[in-house]
């Protein structure tokens, strides 16, 4: 949202200082300066006058008629020039009207004009004050005025004191004054607005500003650039720092000025940070946290990484996650925990007190879980610190595998990964979760254009080489079922996968050339990068893996081989909760899920609970792991661990 005060033909915004503070040096000087009369012929427009847009002939003529009838009601403000001349800093329209009367021989060139003479160093400020109070002052004029005063050596604070503006507003206008001349010319000619200029001001390099401006004009309707396109072109390799959990965790001090881009014109005065630099800084801090935990808790090794250790093929070959031992509470902790739970249950609504109670209970639980890891366990294991769902994820009891371990543990791994029978899952839940899974696979595939291209090519080859060539050019059809998928998936349109898909769609739609739907040749002008992005997105949207059940038999998910090919993990896009999953299961299924995840202690506790409480219990204990129901993920490859399994034909 624009916060500038200089947009043409809009009300003055709040950056003006209150009226009581507007008694500036200039106004005080003008109040003390006596009027004098000088001949009309000695007056010219001051070179320091910020007015650049010509006065309309009609307005000058109307003012001339008024002066003819009642005389000059307001004096002009001038400064001395060489040769007994005076430059008009405030009152340019009145000077134009007087000259019009002289041209009509209504007054003489020596007609006495009432003026106040001020020092030359205050001339620009006088012009700014005169025009700044007028509704028709053009933004380009205000920008030029601020720049002129800055070139005189005045600081933003001094300029603000002279004119009654806040220093912040002056800084913003001076930022616009640094734009490339061609852009300021476009503003003066009303081909763009201050909003366009604010977006372009994100880039400091004037050559790059012009490049972005021209590209936005070419892609805009009728040559009119779109503010969003400008902003996207400048920040395409960056992310906003506002509400960014990674940036908040790392901190601004972790970046150099070149890696941060400040947006002076945003409401929160935020900005952008380079994606690569942000991830590098995040990884460095995660490693530092891991080192601290290794020393403090006595683990053999540690690692900081971007993703948690999961069950994908690469991680399963390198790591083994030990089952989490049951928490070990001291007698004092158990008494305190019971007391806190009683106080928490007594509260009817969530409030500050309930948040404090929950935080203390979580701290006690965390300490008990850490204590459960014995020195023997820690001596042969490590701690991995990663980033997940906007928070730090700590995995303790991670062991490094040797090559022999992969073979020796094959049978045990299969037992852990043994799928629950999909036939035991209700059909409504099967539809819901396979829809959720489909959206997640779409979002993951969208991020891997090379795999999308391979999948599309394979699909086309099935038709071409299997059924003969088409009789018409490019008989390709694509059915996007986002409406039904979001209707069935528990997360609906609020899920991480669907929101990622829609964000990419919004990014791509502004890159489509004008008239593209009527003329395919418009796509010939697109870069290979844009074409590949469009192709990848459209291919991803065609993925459909909703399972059905007929005659008591559940269809096999077509997503299994594709997930293996792209290294997909459902928990990157979905978090099981009571509302979206556990609440739809029977109590024995909830207990089985906890056991399958290696949480045998939590499973035993769930046996004593009602179904609703067991569902909440499962949500709490599953939030920090990577468990996915066996029937919702691709089976682990049965071949040798070193054999490649990402065959692109199988992927489709």
UniProtKB/Swiss-Prot annotation:
UniProt keyword annotations, A-Z: Plasmid
Record-linked Gene3D superfamilies: 1.10.10.2830, 3.90.1530.30
UniProt cross-references to SUPFAM superfamilies, sorted A to Z: KorB DNA-binding domain-like, ParB/Sulfiredoxin
Compositionally biased intervals (Basic and acidic residues): 1-13
Chain residue ranges for the region called Disordered: 1-21
GO MF entries: DNA binding
Family annotation (Pfam families): ParBc (PF02195)
Keyword field contains Endoplasmic reticulum: no
Similarity remark: Belongs to the ParB family.
Protein name stated in the entry: Uncharacterized protein YubM
Species assigned in the record: Escherichia coli (strain K12)
